[in-house]
Amino acid sequence: MKRIFLLIATNMAILLVASIVMSILGVNTSTMSGLLVFAAIFGFGGAFISLAISKWMAKKTMGCEVITNPRDNTERWLVETVARQAEQAGIKMPEVAIYQSQEFNAFATGPSKNNSLVAVSSGLLYGMNHDEIEAVLAHEVSHVANGDMVTLTLIQGVVNTFVIFAARVVAGIINNFVASNDEEGEGLGMFAYMAVVFVLDMLFGILASIIVAYFSRIREFKADEGGARLAGKEKMIAALDRLKQGPETGAMPASMSALGINGKKSMAELMMSHPPLDKRIAALRAS
């Protein structure tokens, strides 16, 4: 799975920096190849920087306490369960952490399959039974084993590149149109041009978010299938059913919630990073 705000803020910062650098360097939007190179550098660069610092960012933003020496039987069981599932999935043991939140949630993050973090909320850890928690952990381990962190980063890089490129191409067309109808042929001017680019960044960014959310929902179904293989289908179904009874989600930043077990509800399913729980349960029962 706050994640939506963090993701939007990160991407807006990337787009703003891209605009400033392009203006300073005098990148000509009519030169498609040059613009595309800049768009790709900032689009993929920002996405991969986010991936590289994802574990550090998750620990800081969520206040994750990594379990190095289990303090009680619950923590010991948690670490042992993740270790067993990681071995089954053929990945290196992730770091295991707990963060304080009453919501029933968990997430996986990290730059690679063999450098990852699996974290669970205190609400989930003490509000669900062992079978349900085992299934949740299996779901998160499956995210790691499926390489979903890198997959979603690549998708984010592509859509970032599209947003940067398309916004400036359209702004260039508008600028040329204004210049052709201006006696002095000056066009929009730098500040007006940047304002148009910013608005277009927002509009195309909404479309990009819908695309990323679509792929995220697909990965959720896959992680549910993987969780069912590692923990058992009935346990996975029971865990998803239990999530429906838990507190409303919303404390997790968007950069983590896409790889969480329980997504934030939205009136528009197109914008949801997770399919509705009923659909996920139905898909498991039909498999």
Swiss-Prot record:
GO CC terms in record: plasma membrane
Residue spans crossing the bilayer: 4-24, 33-53, 154-174, 195-215
GO molecular function: metalloendopeptidase activity; zinc ion binding
GO biological process terms on file: proteolysis
Cofactor(s) the record lists: Zn(2+)
Keywords on record: Cell inner membrane, Cell membrane, Hydrolase, Membrane, Metal-binding, Metalloprotease, Protease, Transmembrane, Transmembrane helix, Zinc
Cell membrane listed as a keyword: yes
Gene3D superfamilies on file: Metalloproteases ('zincins'), catalytic domain
Record's cofactor remark: Binds 1 zinc ion per subunit.
Domain of life, source organism: Bacteria
Positions with a binding annotation for Zn(2+): H139, H143, E220
Cellular compartments annotated: Cell inner membrane
Annotated catalytic residues: E140
EC code: 3.4.24.-
Family from the record: Belongs to the peptidase M48B family.
This protein's name: Protease HtpX
Lineage per the UniProt record: Bacteria, Pseudomonadati, Pseudomonadota, Gammaproteobacteria, Alteromonadales
